[in-house]
Structure formats: structure tokens, C-alpha cells
Amino acid sequence: MKHYAILLCWFSLVLGCKNSTEKSEGNKPINHTDTVIINTEATDEKPETLRTFEGLSDTTFIRLADFSNQFVYDMRYATENNFLKAKVYDCPECYTRVKTAKALIAANEEFVKNGVKIKFFDCYRPNSVQYKMWEIVPNPQYVANPVKGSIHNKGGAVDITLVTLDGVELDMGTDFDFFGKKAYHDNTDLPQDILDNRKLLKETMEKYGFWSIRTEWWHYNLSAASNDKVANFKWPCD
């Protein structure tokens, strides 16, 4: 049986959430509360029994793999295979707020009907990790300023692509984290199959409440998450 802990994480007090008191250099402590559902056993991308959202508020943070087994994960910032050329996560996990997870699951159900599904490159990002990224690349064109934080830090943004039901990535024209005009949504100087793949991704995500960034075909923000607070909890690693 899976065991879960519901943690109220005060970022100015120690009440059980790993690294909850960590201060980012040059930043004041985050002093609000977030509820986080933590799997206290070894992580498993496909748990035998899926959890439900019953009784959870829309702002609760959850591990997406505990609520759906229909996604694929390639969490790039837990590796050096990213534009930073640095590993900034201790281990690969995909956490979001409940409202983000609900929208992602609904969108993915529609994708599956079209023979594809979502593959994740990044999800919730602790604010302290945003500072690590800023130290490596202190350029707001590529990394959001951690003082204000980003929607990734709020649990409402994801970096994604589409794969077939057998796990083969659709061609989107560039790799994740390619910064150039070829990755722009408004770049139509691409083969038709790539344009069709991007259109399917964008139109479906928008249908379920997400909006995109013009320069990154992979990045989607949940509109309903814009006013949420920046968070800084870190998930446990083995």
C-alpha cells in the first residue's frame, strides 16, 4: 500500500517539508503556506493504485504520477541535458498544483484520442532552483528573474511535447530549450508536419486553459495559476 504525507509547508518555519527554510541568495524568506501531498515510499512513475482529487483544494501540490499513469517524463533539469548544461534538481519529479494537474489530465485524455500523449520536460520548479538557474544564466531572456519568480515556481507551468502512444516523440522542429526563431510559434517557415504537430499541441492546451509563450513551443502556463504565490518546497529523493 502506498503511504502519503500531507504537509503544510511554512517557508519561514521548520514543520516537516524538506528544505522548507532554505533561503535563496539575495532573497527574503518565503513566508506563506503550501499544502503538499508527498509519497513517503520509493517513487514510482506508474503506481499500482492511483489517487483521486477528492478532498484536495485546487492549490494543493501533488505528484502528477500519483494521479495519472498516462504521461511520459524526461525531466531535463535533473540531468545535464539542458541549456544550462547543469543538473539543478536532485532527482526527477513532476509536481503541480491540483488545478494544473486536472487541466493536464483532461488535455491528455483528448491527446490520447488523437493517438498521442504528453511528455514532460519540466513542471513545478522550487524558487531556490530558479536562483540556481539565474546564477548560471543571469539573463531574463532565458531565465525568469527569481526575485519575482515564474509560473513554474507557482506550480502552474509545464514544459512539454507530444509522443505517440508507443513513446516516439513527434517532430516539433527543435529540441526542448532551443532558443532561436525556429522555436517560435509564429515561425511558419517549417515543414507542414511540424506545423501540424505544434498546432495540435497549442490548440489542445489552450482549450484546457493554458496559454503559450511566443518564443517557446514547449512552454505552457495555466491561466488560473497566474495569481498563485511562488513556492519553494523540495520533493524528497531516495
Map each language-model feature to its residues.
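Sec-dependent signal peptide recognition
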Residues: 2-8
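C-terminal motif of bacterial Sec signal peptides marking the signal peptidase cleavage site
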Residues: 13-16
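Short, conserved catalytic or interaction motifs in soluble domains
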Residues: 19
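Extracytoplasmic cell-surface/polysaccharide-interacting catalytic and binding patches
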Residues: 22-121, 136, 140-215, 221-238
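Extended, low-complexity, intrinsically disordered C-terminal regulatory tails
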Residues: 121-135
